[in-house]
C-alpha cells in the first residue's frame, strides 16, 4: 500500500492538484493507494470520489487546520498499524511536517517540492522546511530552481 498526504486534490483545479491526482491514479494501477486529503467542497468531492478507480481510496478531512492535521495523522496511524506501507508521499513539506516526527522511520517518505512553497519568510520558517527535508528519505523537485534550494 502507498499513502499520499495532500492538501491539494481534485476536484479543486490547479497544477499541484493535477500532479497529485495523476501520480496517485497511476500508482493505483499497480498498488492500492490511500489519499488523505483536505476537504473543501463536500458535494463536488463526494461526486468526484465516487467515480474513481476502486484501487484508489480517498479520505478527506475538513475543519480547522489544527484539527485537520491531527485527524489525518490519526488515520495515518491506523492505516500503518493495519497495513504494510511501501511509501508515504506528500504533496509538500507542509503535509509531512506533523507526521514526519511521529511515523515509523522504517517507512520510506517522499516529499514533492514546488518552487513557491519554499520561498522563505523568516528564519523560523526556513528551519521548519529544513527540518522536514532532513527527515524525508527522498525529495522530488519540480524544477531546477527548486532543486537549488
Task: Cite the ranges covered by each PLM segment.
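Short His-centered aromatic/hydrophobic patch
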Residues: 90-96
Amino acid at each position: 500500500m502507498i499513502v499520499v498526504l495532500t492538501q491539494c486534490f481534485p476536484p479543486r483545479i490547479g497544477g499541484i492538484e493535477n500532479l497529485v491526482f495523476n501520480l496517485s491514479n497511476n500508482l493505483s494501477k499497480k498498488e492500492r493507494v490511500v489519499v488523505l486529503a483536505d476537504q473543501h467542497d463536500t458535494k463536488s468531492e463526494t461526486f468526484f470520489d465516487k467515480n474513481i478507480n476502486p484501487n484508489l481510496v480517498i479520505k478527506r478531512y475538513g475543519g480547522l487546520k489544527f484539527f485537520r492535521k491531527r485527524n489525518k495523522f490519526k488515520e495515518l496511524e491506523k492505516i500503518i498499524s493495519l497495513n504494510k506501507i511501501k511509501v508515504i508521499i506528500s504533496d509538500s513539506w507542509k503535509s509531512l511536517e506533523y507526521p514526519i516526527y511521529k511515523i515509523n522511520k522504517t517507512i520510506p517518505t517522499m516529499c514533492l517540492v514546488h518552487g513557491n512553497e519554499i520561498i522563505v519568510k523568516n528564519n523560523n520558517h526556513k528551519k521548519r522546511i529544513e527540518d522536514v527535508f532532513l527527515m524525508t528519505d527522498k525529495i522530488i523537485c519540480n524544477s531546477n530552481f527548486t532543486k537549488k534550494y
